């Protein structure tokens, strides 16, 4: 059933993690400590973590009834992107199976991280821990950062700074401040994708009591200014 879960884990969003990872690999290809096999292990871990967190987002959204709220809003004439887990509501999979799929993807990511940790040392553990907490807390746990106006910031940190400095350290065993600076720019680009969705869904998010950066900004003028 692996293909089923890969297909439902929003693989269309994978460029958001793969492209920054490849960019970091290209930036780290010159140092003497560069390792291609470490790059492959790290890339596999990043992909599995991304898919796992996408499915975790589905799991937590299902728990709070996100689909029901959006369907009700569409019925009232408001624009609301429909739910992300038709495979659950249609009976193709159960919530328990979804939870297990999340565990499998994230477990593979952790194994990849432990391999890199063994060869590169404790900084990788710190990056993994921060990424794990942010990934789960985006829509789950007590924080639910994506529901309180911090979703765009979380995405920018995870897919920009953490991903790129983690990948570079994995392939080279060193940190480069040039990569750190570039990772901030990449994070802002990825953040723009999420922010654009929040601008389009601002009315639906307001009705569903979901706070996003677009809602924090308020006026259309401020929203467009931030997008620029």
Stretches with model-predicted labels:
Residues 22, 32-56, 125-133, 176-196:
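Membrane-embedded alpha-helical segments that form the functional core of polytopic membrane enzymes
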Residues 12-16, 37-41, 97-104, 123-127, ...:
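Alpha-helical transmembrane segments of integral membrane proteins
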Residues 1-41, 45, 53, 143:
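Topogenic membrane-insertion module of multi-pass membrane proteins
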Residues 153-202, 206-208:
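Functional transmembrane core segments of multi-pass inner-membrane proteins
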Residues 15-24, 153-168, 215-219:
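Small-residue-rich segments of transmembrane alpha-helices in multi-pass membrane proteins
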Residues 29-34, 59-63, 122, 140-148, ...:
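Membrane-interface elements of multi-pass transporters and channels
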Residues 84-174:
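Intramembrane alpha-helical segments
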Residues 56-103, 190-228:
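Solvent-exposed interhelical
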